Amino acid sequence: MHYYSVHSVIFIVVILVLFGGMRGGFKLKLRPYNLCNAAQYTQQSYLILSNPFCLFRTIGAGSIEELNYFSEMELEEIFSPYHFPSDSLRYNLEGRNIVLFILESFSKEHSKFYNPDLYPAEDGYTPFLDSLMAEGYVFTNAYANGLRSIEALPSILTSIPSYKAPFVMLPQSLGNLEGFPTILKNLGYSTSFFCGTEKNSMFFEAYASMAGIENFYAKDEYMAECAVNENTIEPFWGVYDMPFFLFMADKIDEMEEPFCVTSFNLTSHHPFRLPSDYADKMPQGHTLVQPCVAYSDLSIRKFFEKSSQKPWFKNTIFIFIADHVSPEIYAPQTCYPRGRMAIFYFLYTPDKVLQGLDPQVTQQLDVMPTLLGLLGYDKPYFSFGRDVFNEPERFSIATSYINEVYQGIADSLTIYFDGEKVISAFAADDIFQKNNLLNNREVNVMERNLKAILQSYYQQLKKQQYIVPHDAVDRMSKK
């Protein structure tokens, strides 16, 4: 009996060790290691990936779809992820610093600036960001390309979408990649990422490394230098937004210009906890997330108060964009698929060089090409988005995968495509999607454009190539 008891205990211990080894640890917040984690240690990630690990992590990943809606020549005429910047630019902010705030669960519905009718007698939950929008360049029709945080980083930093599966989880993500941080690094920028969680809890560090970010500041870096107590550390995720943003401000002060800083906040994520010294000071909210959104907004205000007198501040482009819409929903229109993607997105420059309201459809994929255009970047680059200021020839359509179909959002129409045909279409102002316009002539044009994007996407996945190839540059030079 003793023999079997001992061996049973040994068996259980071995199983637990194997489980922890495959996950990469035992912490609740930790995501199991994936192929992209290799990018943290070398740019040649294939050199350190073992065959058994690759086999284990790719079982069930499925093969890449073969979409052949168009010939190669037809496809190139409709859509290409290869961008060749023009000589004439609407703005030239070359050499400016970049500070990019990726805002957790910042649905469009939280803002009174975006929704004055939703909050006729309230201030909304983002009063400080609303004040910046009043002086900034606001995209009033902006959309996320996914429903989860893990899908946001590839869309924003490398302009690559996720559809049926998060791009970062695909083995094909380990291809030739040149993200926005990589391009800026080649221009002499330092690149840093700030997120108050533990490293790799959401593959953030792994994908940030793939995208070209050199320096990663997380919970450990904060705890090594700053106060640790119940008002600074949230027990599940990591550092509360306010102390972490102030820590980020201090670190930025130490950087040489030009720099590119990306931050990803935590407090507006489930389980929606607030530090005790602010728990009773935030507005109650209509949903669980809104008091936390108000706290995150206040945290950004404190960051600006601390940084606004620093020498680097006036020479900086600030970008604010949500990672996705919160599952906590208040506005009726947010319940419908188009509204489930409607997010914050605006630019702010202290010298007011960028101001206005832009009603055209924009998406997370547009961040990288738009910023490259603002910085005067003149070399070819790879992107599934568009430079909203300098590429009027590219059609504007925000894409996503929701409810097992592809969604295409344009200025006047939203379509739903099952991979073979459009199954429904609705006018943009039909927010509750009651009147199906399936036979509308404009649907055919949108279907064609969406098919071209999807065919190009799956082709690039199969090639594992997310850069502009030399032959495309040669073809362009001959035109």
Locate the predicted segments by residue.
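N-terminal secretory/membrane-targeting segments
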Residues: 1-96, 113, 119-126, 133, ...
